Amino acid sequence: MFSVIVIYFKKIQIHSYQEIIDGALNYLKTKVPDVYNRTHNTTYYPLDFKKLLEYCPKLESAFDEYSIKCNMAVAYIMYNNTHSTIHIDKFHHDARINIPLLNCIGTKTIFFSGGEYEIVQNPLTKTNAKRLKSLNGIKVVTQVEIDDTTVIRVNEPHTVIMNAEQSPRITLSLGFDKDPVFLLAD
């Protein structure tokens, strides 16, 4: 019998890393302060990608060496650990690429197997996800600190634990013209 090895994450290098971080934070603070300040009761905020590109023009070419083009961005913002639960993103690709923007050192993205899930809808953004309904069979598989550009498998159960002494914790979660899951292969 074969056993399948699932790779949940992989750190990669991109061009203009710091410029993208600086531009994205500037965009969040000046153009969508309600998102930065998390005035809405949601953690997952799809961003206006064209407006974000005005602040992060290098985002268009940052992934050229991987032959993928970024075409969507989400700000994932937490002010405390109740803002993330074990969930599975309901996304048309198996992976996204996350860039740490603020206070990600000392935080963990934890991946799980098992559990029972139900589909829930974000009331603000109308996006769907699967949220843990039952701990039946749940166990930790692995974890990663998003301290650099990281491909993560969003179609597997995961959650984020932040350093409660440093908030907000913000990552930029990126989608592409083709699924970046191929970057998780050895």
Where are these regions (language model features)?
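Non-heme Fe(II)/2-oxoglutarate
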Residues: 1-68, 75
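Short, well-ordered beta-strand micro-motif
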Residues: 8, 100, 151-153
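Short amphipathic alpha-helical surface micro-motifs
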Residues: 24, 51-61, 67, 78-82, ...
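Residues at beta-strand starts and edge strands
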Residues: 3-6, 93-95, 166-170
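Catalytic core of non-heme Fe(II) oxygenases with the double-stranded beta-helix
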Residues: 68-149
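Catalytic core of Fe(II)/2-oxoglutarate
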Residues: 122-186
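Short beta-strand-to-loop capping motifs
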Residues: 11-14, 101, 174-176
